[in-house]
UniProtKB/Swiss-Prot annotation:
Listed InterPro entries: GTP-dep_dephospho-CoA_kin (IPR007164)
First-level EC class: transferase
Name this polypeptide is given: GTP-dependent dephospho-CoA kinase
GO MF, one annotated term: kinase activity
E.C. no: 2.7.1.237
Lineage: Archaea, Methanobacteriati, Methanobacteriota, Stenosarchaea group, Halobacteria
Organism: Halorubrum lacusprofundi (strain ATCC 49239 / DSM 5036 / JCM 8891 / ACAM 34)
Amino acid sequence: MLTLPESLRDAFKEPLGPVTIDADELLAAAAETRGERAAPDAPIIAVGDVVTYHLREAGRVPDVALIDGKTERETVDAEIGSALAAADDRRLSVENPAASLSAELLEALSEALSDADPVIIEVTGEEDLAALPAILAAPDGASVVYGQPGEGMVRVAVTPESRTEARELFEALDGDVEAAYKALGRVPDGDR
């Protein structure tokens, strides 16, 4: 549905938020954002196996987790793979090619965000670009957490400002952006 053009690859290397290696610090910042935005139930969305694992190890099961069994295109180590496989969260399985956002992934993300219980979206392919639609679909006060290769975890506080930045990148992808918004259950200019 949407693909990352070669000309935009560098734009996606810059983190969309602060980077940390401390899951407890990240969770404290997420709680602060929920308080500031008067959104005590705002979700935490984790994009990536290692990020999901670290949040779970810190005692916070992500409301939505997107995993693909890989980190930096290599299979995650056995400890992480086993821990995530043992999680008893509801699971959705989708296919999503590398450097892409499939309708299947976008629809699953929308469905998972509407579920009151934690959901793991298991991706065959890659989930690397999923932070963008997660930022667009999540409510104000949510946190989207993804891995920054070689650096740590990036936390994006979902606000109108971060949604605008994500929207600009999302709309710069190649493909049918209107259909992608529809699959995500959003209108192009609509903040939550």
